[in-house]
Amino acid sequence: MLDSLKIARADLVTHDIGNMVGFAFAALHPDRVGKFVLIDAPVPGVGPWEEILKNPLLWHFRFGGPDMERLVAGRERIYLDRFWNEFSAVPAHFDEASREHYAKLYALPGAMHSGFAQFAAFDQDAIDNRALLGQKGKLKMPVLAIGGEKSFGTQMATVMSAGADNVTGAIIPGSGHWIMEENPQATVAAVRAFLVPARTKKTKS
């Protein structure tokens, strides 16, 4: 996409599964990434991954087997509500309109299959990411690791320090995992404070 848009270098801002995609891109193409913001989700194979997997809130990482899709088919909203409720500081902040919207999308043919496939790929992701770190070393670009106060919190920066040399941490107060729904103002402010100074400096020069 960057090539199509003729963009040589970009800042990355990622959340959840996006962190994993972003980490792989940043590791493989460090010259294409200026700064990297990861929001409230661990990256497989980075830091104490096996210990992270023991967190009972991450039960879905290991929710697999031949019948999982049939168990959820037609009950997508029930399954998804557990995520929105358990991972929120205040479940009401993930509003009904958003819940209905995402539940309809996940009820489409193949959607839940793809969702489960993401989690099933984590073991291979961990192997690949450890190999990348072994071959290329830690990320060198500035990294901001944001955690929701009621979610990964300070653990985000601690874990990402195992995968990057220049890590800054930030906490979004009163927020769980869904930080853009729960505290968008603080989230945008944290991201802008990290990214904008570099852009301002480039503009002045």
Mark where each language-model region is:
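Catalytic histidine-centered segment of alpha/beta-hydrolase-like enzymes
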Residues: 175-184, 188
